[in-house]
Curated annotation (Swiss-Prot):
Probably degraded by CplXP and Lon proteases. It holds the Pfam family RnlB_antitoxin. It comes from the Bacteria. It comes from Escherichia coli (strain K12). Disruption phenotype: Essential, it cannot be deleted unless rnlA is also disrupted. Keywords: Toxin-antitoxin system. Induction: Not repressed by IscR. rnlA-rnlB forms an operon, the downstream rnlB also has its own promoter. Antitoxin component of a type II toxin-antitoxin (TA) system. A labile antitoxin (half-life of 2.1 minutes) that inhibits the endonuclease activity of cognate toxin RnlA but not that of non-cognate toxin LsoA. This is Antitoxin RnlB.
Length: 123
């Protein structure tokens, strides 16, 4: 499952999509495209940032960007993004969302220690 935590974030970044459990949201790409097209319009072109923390854990592949062209997510454009390259205001919003939705953490692959670390993050 997934939650869209931001739209028209900044510049080319059109949306942020967060995994809300152990399933990778990229397995629901058609549903994501439908929801993003409803929010942004079917002619939207830009970048989508995926936070896969709940699906992948606090690993090197937590953040991935994909291009969206005219409402379609282009899977062949996937790029892994280092956490240091994610703007602080986005990290802060993601942490805020996780703190307010403990069910996301409970449905994730995160260990109890990982959950404590996520909840103690401060941006």
């Amino acid at each position: 499952m997934f939650e869209i935590t931001g739209i028209n974030v900044s510049g080319a970044l059109k949306a942020v999509v967060m995994a809300t459990g152990f399933e990778n949201p990229l397995s629901s790409v058609n549903e994501i495209e439908t929801k993003l097209s409803a929010l942004l319009g079917s002619e939207t072109t830009g970048e989508i940032l995926f936070d896969l923390l709940c699906a992948n854990g606090p690993e090197w592949n937590r953040f991935v960007t994909l291009e969206m062209k005219y409402g379609r997510i282009m899977l062949d454009t996937a790029k892994i993004i280092d956490e240091q390259d994610v703007p602080t205001h986005i990290l802060s919003k993601l942490t805020f969302t996780l703190r307010n939705h403990p069910e996301y953490l409970e449905a994730s692959v995160l260990s109890p220690d990982d959950v404590r670390q996520v909840l103690s993050m401060d941006f």
